[in-house]
Amino acid sequence: MAKDFRDITLALAGICQASRLVQQIAYQGNADEKDVEVMVNSIFNINPTSTLDVYSNQISHLKLGFQTIKAIHQAVRREKLTFELMTYQQGLINLERIINKNNDYSSHLSQKISQLERQKNYFEPLSDGLFNALAGVYSDAVSPVGPKIQVNGSIELLKNPIIQAKVRGLLLTGLRSAVLWRQVGGRRFDFLLHQKTILRQTDDFLAQC
């Protein structure tokens, strides 16, 4: 069956957007709330009608993700921030593979997300309480299963418990997109083997943002 690179690129943009937001929070302590909200909402969209529906049916909601795909491709590999983004992206894809291959891991994560979905109305959107809850899911159901994603940033910021919670919460949103990436046919080496196709599709999406 032929790969649908439209859907694959959308899911990859979700992974990259989450990775970039993690980086922004870790270095700056803040990020665009609309970009963050799109990613947080994606976790609770358990039964989407399409790939784009995961991101509220708006291509523009993934603009940062498309820009990040381009940045990763265009930058020199030795550039520190770009290397970090590549590390986060691949780390999320690898973690998802480990979880997907183990029924206990995947069931535990699904249960935690379902439980949080039932409780989400008790939290204000993007509140510290919500991020603490998201971080709790990540720490309980994701961190123990495989190699930890080492996040770089401001040492002082990363000592802050709410910054830590936001980083873990956003990594969880990236894992949601990594699940989607696999479901639509994405594979670990697609960005290398089908780079031109993905970049062309990325340019098409950016033109619509």
Swiss-Prot record:
Record keywords: Cell inner membrane, Cell membrane, Cytoplasm, Membrane
Listed InterPro entries: HflD, HflD-like_sf
Superkingdom classification of source: Bacteria
Gene3D superfamilies, per the entry: HflD-like
GO CC entries: cytoplasm; plasma membrane
Compartments reported by the entry: Cytoplasm; Cell inner membrane
Membrane association type: Peripheral membrane protein
Recorded family membership: Belongs to the HflD family.
Name under which the protein is recorded: High frequency lysogenization protein HflD homolog
UniProt organism field: Proteus mirabilis (strain HI4320)
Lineage: Bacteria, Pseudomonadati, Pseudomonadota, Gammaproteobacteria, Enterobacterales
